[in-house]
Every structure is written in C-alpha cells, then in structure tokens.
C-alpha cells in the first residue's frame, strides 16, 4: 500500500525541502519506489532535482486545477519521479476554491498511487489550500523544526490545521513525529529548546525523532549542485543523521 507523507511546518527555513529530498532519496537508495511532489511556489525541491520550474509543461498547480492529469505532469529525473512546482502556486488560494477543493490532490493521485511505495510532499510555509491538500492526501505528516522559539509557534499553528483536517477531511492522518533540523548540539539554547519540543510532542500525541539533523553546509551545497545529500557527501554529518532518521521512520 502506498504511503503518502507530507513534510510541513508553518515556519519557513526549517529544512522542509532538505528533509523531503533526503527522505525520498534515502528511500530510493533502499529500493523503494518514490514520487516527489513539490507544492511550494519557491520550487526548491523541483530545482534540487535538476528541473527548471519555468520549463515544465505541466505542474502540480495544473493537476490541482484539473487541467492536467498527474500521469501527464510527472517528470522522470535522475533523482526520482517528480510532480514539479511552478511559481504560480503563490496564487493557489485564489485559483483553487469551491466545493471539494481540499480533496483535489488526493483524487488526482488515486490513479497513479500504486506505482509508488512512497509519495513525499514538500509543502509551502503557509497553512492555505496547498498544505490542506497535502494533509488531506497523506497518511503521515513529518514536522521539521529548529530548536528555537519560533518553531514552537509554527508547530502550534500547524497542529490547529492538522486537527481540522483530521476532523473534516482525513481522519486517518497521523503526526509521525517532529524532526529537529539545523541542530547545534553544543548550544545551551538548542538543548533547552529540544526539551520544549519534546513537551510539545507529548501534547500533540507524537514524538521527537531521536536523531536531530545537525547544521551542515553540505546540505546547501548538495542543493546547489542538484544532488541528494548522500551522493554529494556520504560522510557528512547531515548524511549520517538523515540515514539514522530514515531507519527510525521505517521502524516506526
């Protein structure tokens, strides 16, 4: 059965795209069939997989609007299959509305879902129609968060949206866990905030993954070269941390 995973947080700059890319690439390395979906108008995941967003004939927005089938819009890249983004996703809240708007991604994926073991969705740093579509289509949500006060606020806001989705559009949605990213283990603030994140995880009925993703320049360098972190720097801290996270994810 296909497992669909949304990577979400209201706050930007917490490593959503890096986590989506690393999770999908790591699963591919283990032999799983993976589809990446980019719902962020910044198109960072699309770019990381080597696709110029301005050159795509059909995007995730076209699929959500119903002007293209998912099977027609999916691109095969060296890093995996991708439903690419477009900058026009920034206007999605105005373009995608009306009865059943929350179900458009879920319904669009049904004809092709069986081709994949995992569908990984990178969401925008907002709680509008795109994130609601991602959550409605997903079995699980992973919340990347830095060990800082602003991430706590972002999680609280996201949790409200997740609760609404669980109540109205997707009762099976589960918060798989909070993944600490850009972690500075020697920082007293980071250590204290990690404790706060663990308290928040208990409140929302989830967990903090045991392995935080350490701050690592290799992540940005890999993105700049359109390469996954494992291929770019197998021995980097980020590569090791994401590998450990994936083992925990699969075991959970």
Feature annotation, model-predicted:
Residues 1-252:
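P-loop NTP-binding core
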